[in-house]
């Protein structure tokens, strides 16, 4: 009797699924979980006091909801876990490197690739060559490590993000954009001190907000006018491309 009821329910649900639109569902299943626990107010007060009110000194297990960054917070797929077993960790000539280089070159056209373990390591390598004392580096809300690597070389990180990015109640499609007027002003006044323009996509410090394709073209045009290269901190370039596809006119039918 129970089996009959289950089958009838399944058939009914299957029929309904063909006659009405089902609610949105993610296209993956979760295979692994990590335990977390809620803390008490007394515990949190004690922990933050012991950390001298510096949230960077808190232990990760003391934080129930971590909003400090979206880096390293996503689960890996079963294909990624399986790929770790196939990875070649040879000291030189690793096949893993050539696979990575092939994909990056195909996507970007760049021939020379230097893999790093983290974005801040890439910044250190690049800025050691490009940034010097007294330089000014304009961009859209430099990430904290980006700003640190610039200021650590006695240079200035100049924020040229649009003012709307600071209005938390304002909803616009591309709050991570560079303000063209601010960028133009910086280049007019300090061109000789500016080695490059950096654009972070998505704009992490401004809440992970995207940058429009139109804005990227405007930045490129202004930089070209003054003969300056444009660098991307492109940690979330795929997400930014998705937002362009969804929100910017003319890109709905473009692939990511």
What are these regions (language model features)?
Residues 21-75, 80, 89-113, 117-256:
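Conserved PLP-enzyme active-site core in the AAT-like
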């Amino acid at each position: 009797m129970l089996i009959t009821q289950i089958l009838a329910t399944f058939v009914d649900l299957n029929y309904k699924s063909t006659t009405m639109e089902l609610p949105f569902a993610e296209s993956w299943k979760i295979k692994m979980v990590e335990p977390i626990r809620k803390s008490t107010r007394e515990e949190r007060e004690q922990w933050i006091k012991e950390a001298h009110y510096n949230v960077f000194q808190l232990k990760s297990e003391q934080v129930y909801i971590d909003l400090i960054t979206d880096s390293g917070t996503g689960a890996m797929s079963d294909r990624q876990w399986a790929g770790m077993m196939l990875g070649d960790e040879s000291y030189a000539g690793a096949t893993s490197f050539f696979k990575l280089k092939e994909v990056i070159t195909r996507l970007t056209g760049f021939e020379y690739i230097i893999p790093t373990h983290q974005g801040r390591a890439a910044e250190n390598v690049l800025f050691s060559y490009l940034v010097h004392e007294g330089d000014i580096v304009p961009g859209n809300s430099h990430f904290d490590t980006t700003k640190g690597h610039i200021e650590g070389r006695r240079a200035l990180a100049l924020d040229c993000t649009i003012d709307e990015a600071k209005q938390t109640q304002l909803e616009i499609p591309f709050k991570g954009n560079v303000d063209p007027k601010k960028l133009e002003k910086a280049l007019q006044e300090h061109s000789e001190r500016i080695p490059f323009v950096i654009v972070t996509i998505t704009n992490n410090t401004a809440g992970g907000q995207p940058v429009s394709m139109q804005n990227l073209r405007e930045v490129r045009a202004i930089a070209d006018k003054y003969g300056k290269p444009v660098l991307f901190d492109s940690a979330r370039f795929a997400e930014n491309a998705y937002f362009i596809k969804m929100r910017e006119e003319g890109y709905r039918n473009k692939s990511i």
